[in-house]
């Protein structure tokens, strides 16, 4: 890049000058490992894969032979600036360790001459990278050669000003890190608060009870009657296990609930609990358009679907081979492979949809007798999630069985109270989300 290009892009103070980077640093590259130069003593070295912006990853270092002359040329010392030739072109870090080490040929070593603040030029390279002056839009090379690096035009302030600039940048960086740390702490606090709200909700302690509400036991009998009719019609099979549970397996999960609540298995209120299907041919079956095909990554949590990265299958597959997993409005979806237990509710506007085998589908007997949002929030409560995770199968990809889902213990309040609980949860969650958004 020519000097005039930089002069047109940047204005510098009168007591600064422009200069080639190579005039400010002693510049070397490392050693290439090949059969022609295999003599010398085996020593550890680093490559571009060890160098990140302002940091190093030094696990599993490799060794190769270095002769005495190669050691002198390829060794880095504390304070040297390393710059990547390829990969993320121009990525740089300062070696701030007391021990010395060797470098491979795709790394540039810049050792500053007197009156040069190395950290200042690290930040210059970082600024050039962010603005496109290195790679793509600027130097425009597939690799940053020694000649290209040498010829990069950089500003040269007085040495004391270089030091002051570095101090100011690092002070700002520290402030930013502190802000990010506090944001992370706040995010954790918000998630913990949400978890506590859900815990209170499923224990009947979030909203007051109304003695005039129809008890959940009566509600359950109405659901059972509808389910029995579906069984008689041959549309569904009878549950394998009794549906009412008054205590958890450890005799403590489900105690002290309000008198008009009841404990049930999820299967007691479900018409079907199944999972999606892998299309024939796997990913080859995906289309550019057609029927939306959900994967675990589309299940965003609570009641939300993320349709931003949706795959598609053709309508014939949807109606035939994949007919078991045709989704309906208000189906509750649960991830059962990979990241376990995320939930979503299928909205009418997103249909038609299908899903793959990493997603469980829970379809209620009657959506008018159970508030699907209450059920989704219940499945996200710490008690339920920990119970499900405890039952997961520890494989290369953790997974939950449909039996795990069906046997999930649900604290069921009266229908009217379900609605009040959902309203309270969403009001509190909206406030917490507003707080989180204000610090973004």
Task: Specify the residue positions occupied by each region the protein language model found.
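Phosphate/adenylate-binding "loop-and-lid" substructures adjacent to NTP/NAD/dNTP-binding pockets
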Residues: 1-4, 215-255
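Structural signal for hydrophobic
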Residues: 16, 92, 151-152, 162, ...
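Short, well-ordered beta-strand elements within core beta-sheets of diverse protein domains
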Residues: 7-11, 108-112, 150-156, 253-256, ...
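Sequence-specific dsDNA recognition surfaces
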Residues: 6, 22-35, 49-78, 247-252, ...
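Non-catalytic DNA-recognition/assembly elements of restriction-modification systems
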Residues: 2-31, 163, 182, 186, ...
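A short beta-sheet element
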Residues: 47-48, 64-126, 138, 145, ...
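Amphipathic alpha-helical coiled-coil/heptad-repeat segments
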Residues: 131, 151-229, 385-391, 403-440
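Specificity-determining recognition surfaces
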Residues: 125-154, 283, 378-410
């Amino acid at each position: 890049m020519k000097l005039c290009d930089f002069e047109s892009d940047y204005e510098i103070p009168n007591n600064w000058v422009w200069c080639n980077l190579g005039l400010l640093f002693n510049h070397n590259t490392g050693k290439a490992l090949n059969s022609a130069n295999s003599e010398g003593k085996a020593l550890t070295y680093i490559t571009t894969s060890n160098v990140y912006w302002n940091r190093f990853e030094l696990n599993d270092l490799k060794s190769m032979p270095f002769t005495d002359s190669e050691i002198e040329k390829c060794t880095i010392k504390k304070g040297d600036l390393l710059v990547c030739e390829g990969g993320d072109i121009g990525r740089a870090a300062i070696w701030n360790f007391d021990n010395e080490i060797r470098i491979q040929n795709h790394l540039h070593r810049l050792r500053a001459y007197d009156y040069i603040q190395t950290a200042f030029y690290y930040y210059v390279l970082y600024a050039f990278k962010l603005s496109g002056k290195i790679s793509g839009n600027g130097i425009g090379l597939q690799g940053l050669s020694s000649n290209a690096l040498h010829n990069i035009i950089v500003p040269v302030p007085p040495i004391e000003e270089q030091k002051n600039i570095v101090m100011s940048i690092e002070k700002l960086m520290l402030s930013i890190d502190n802000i990010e740390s506090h944001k992370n702490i706040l995010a954790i606090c918000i998630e913990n608060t949400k978890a506590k709200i859900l815990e209170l909700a499923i224990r009947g302690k979030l909203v007051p009870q109304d003695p005039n509400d129809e008890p959940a036991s009566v509600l359950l009998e109405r659901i059972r009657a509808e389910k029995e009719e579906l069984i008689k019609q041959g549309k569904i099979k009878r549950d394998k296990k009794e549906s009412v549970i008054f205590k958890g397996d450890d005799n403590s999960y489900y105690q002290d609930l309000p008198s008009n609540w009841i404990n049930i298995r999820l299967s007691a209120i479900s018409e079907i609990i199944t999972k999606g299907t892998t299309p024939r041919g796997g990913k080859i079956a995906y289309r550019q358009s057609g029927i939306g095909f959900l994967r675990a990554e589309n299940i965003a949590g609570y009641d939300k679907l993320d349709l931003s990265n949706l795959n598609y299958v053709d309508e014939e597959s949807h109606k035939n081979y994949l007919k078991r997993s045709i989704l309906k409005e208000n189906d509750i979806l649960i991830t059962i492979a990979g990241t376990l237990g995320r939930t979503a509710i299928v909205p009418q506007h997103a249909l038609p949809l299908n899903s793959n085998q990493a997603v469980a589908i829970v379809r209620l007997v009657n959506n008018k007798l159970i508030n699907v949002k209450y059920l989704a929030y219940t499945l996200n409560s710490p008690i339920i999630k920990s119970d499900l995770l405890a039952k997961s199968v520890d494989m290369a990809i953790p997974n939950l069985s449909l039996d795990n889902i069906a046997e999930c213990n649900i604290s069921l309040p009266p229908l009217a109270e379900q609605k009040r609980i959902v309203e309270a949860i969403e009001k509190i969650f909206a406030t917490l989300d507003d707080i989180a958004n204000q610090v973004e």
